[in-house]
């Protein structure tokens, strides 16, 4: 092969890699958005269930494994961290309190929000 053909192939490969990188970035943004939306829907669902279940019937119910049948409520601190993340701050232990770059989601923060 001559040098021009090799250069053309390398240039073509570089362009395809750039396109794949852009596509991967878009998928990462979509995934982060879906994880975050799933978290908020989960919290909202728990709050709605809490309103619907009768207070007297579920407080003392225990499953065979010894756990309370009532789901653990998301605490006020967790909601505050979710609000801080929405406002553009890191809540992960790696970058806690620093400002996230505009439009960039942190997978560490999102995994922390989605913990059970």
Curated annotation (Swiss-Prot):
The UniProt regions of compositional bias labelled Polar residues, in chain numbering, are 58-67
Domain of life from the UniProt record: Bacteria
Q: Does the keyword Translocase apply?
A: no
**Cofactor(s) it depends on:** Zn(2+)
Quote the protein name from its UniProt record.
Replication initiation control protein YabA
Q: Which GO terms describe its cellular component?
A: nucleoid
Q: Which residues bind Zn(2+)?
A: 90, 92, 106, 109
Q: What quaternary arrangement does the UniProt entry report?
A: Homotetramer. Interacts with both DnaA and DnaN, acting as a bridge between these two proteins.
Q: Name one GO biological process term.
A: DNA replication
- Write out the ranges of the annotated region (Disordered): 52-73
Q: Where is the signal peptide?
A: none
